Amino acid sequence: MYGIEYTTFLIYLISIILFNYILKSITRMMDYIIYKFLLIVTIASIFISAQNYGINLPITGSMDVAYVNTTKDKPFLTSTLCLYYPTEARTEINDNEWTSTLSQLFLTKGWPTGSIYFKEYDDIATFSVDPQLYCDYNIVLMRYNSSLELDMSELANLILNEWLCNPMDVTLYYYQQTDEANKWIAMGQSCTIKVCPLNTQTLGIGCQTTNTRTFEEVATAEKLVITDVVDGVNHKLDVTTTTCTIRNCKKLGPRENVAVIQVGGADILDITSDPTTTPQTERMMRINWKKWWQVFYTIVDYVNQIVQAMSKRSRSLDSAAFYYRV
C-alpha cells in the first residue's frame, strides 16, 4: 500500500515539474519571438522614413479650449475684466487717478477693484500686430476712423474669432484655400502680399510664376492682413517675409470672451458679411459719445449686460503663441 502511495506522489511531482518546464519553455520562446519582431521593426524604421511634402496639409493643433456659457447671475465676483483703450483716451482725460475712479465706479456694479484691468494700446495698427487678451472677459474700445475702417474690421474679425493656424513656406510651396473658413493671416511691421493663381498645369493665370511683378497685389504695407482668395485654386505667393509672417488659418468659431465697442462713427463695423460668421455677432456694438469720460461712464453702466452676451473662458489669446502655433 505504501509503495502505491509513494508512486502516485512521485507521478504528481514529476508532472508538476514537467508542466513548469513546458511553461518556461513557451515563455522563453514567446519572448524570443516578440523581441525579434521588435528588433526587426526598429531596424526597419531607421531605413523607412516618410516625410509629407504636400502643400495642402491639414491645419492641426488648437490652443483654445471651449467652455460652456456661464449661468451665474454675478460672474464678476470671481472673474477678471480687461478694458483695452487707445492712448488718446488717457491723453484727453488727463487725470492721473482716472483708472482708480473708474475702478470705484465698477465696484458699484459688483466688480471688485482688483478684478478690473486697464490695458492701453497706441493705435489700431499697433494693436493689430500683437493683440493679447488675458482676462476672463475682454472689452476692446476702438475709436472710429474712416481711414482705418478696413483695418478695424480685420482686427475685429481676428479677435472675435478663434483661429487654427499652421506656418506657410511661400518660397518653396504654393497653396490653396480649401473652403470659406480657410484664410491666410499675415502680421508684421509691414506686410505686402501678392498672389498668382495657377491652373492645373501650375502655370500662372494672368501672371508669370517667375516674375513677381506680374502677381496681383492684395495688400500693401499693412500690419494685419486677412487674405481670402478663390477656394480650390493653387496660388503662388510673394510676401515681404523680412517684416511679415504669414500663416494658413482656419476659423473655428466665435471667441466668446471678447467684445468690441466702436466709439463714434455713422455705422457700426460689420464683419457678419463673411459667410463663416454665423450667427450675427452680439459682441460688437457702438457708443456715440465725443468725450472719453462719457464712453467709460456708459461702459460702467452697461458692463453687466455686455458680459451677459459673452462667455467666460479660462484661457487667453496671446497672438505670439497663437500665431506661431504649429
UniProtKB/Swiss-Prot annotation:
Query: Would I find Secreted among this entry's keywords?
Result: no
Q: Which domain of life is it from?
A: Viruses
Q: What is its main location?
A: virion
Query: Which cysteines are disulphide-bonded?
Result: C82-C135, C165-C249, C191-C244, C196-C207
> Where does it live in the cell?
Virion; Host endoplasmic reticulum lumen
Report residues binding Ca(2+) 2.
Answer: Q177, D228, V229, D231, D301
Which residues participate in Ca(2+) 1 binding? D95, G206, T214, E216
Region feature (CNP motif)? 165-167
What's the subunit arrangement here? Homotrimer; disulfide-linked. 2 Ca(2+) ions bound at each subunit interface in the trimer hold the trimer together. Interacts with the intermediate capsid protein VP6. Interacts with the outer capsid protein VP5*.
**What's the protein name?**
Outer capsid glycoprotein VP7
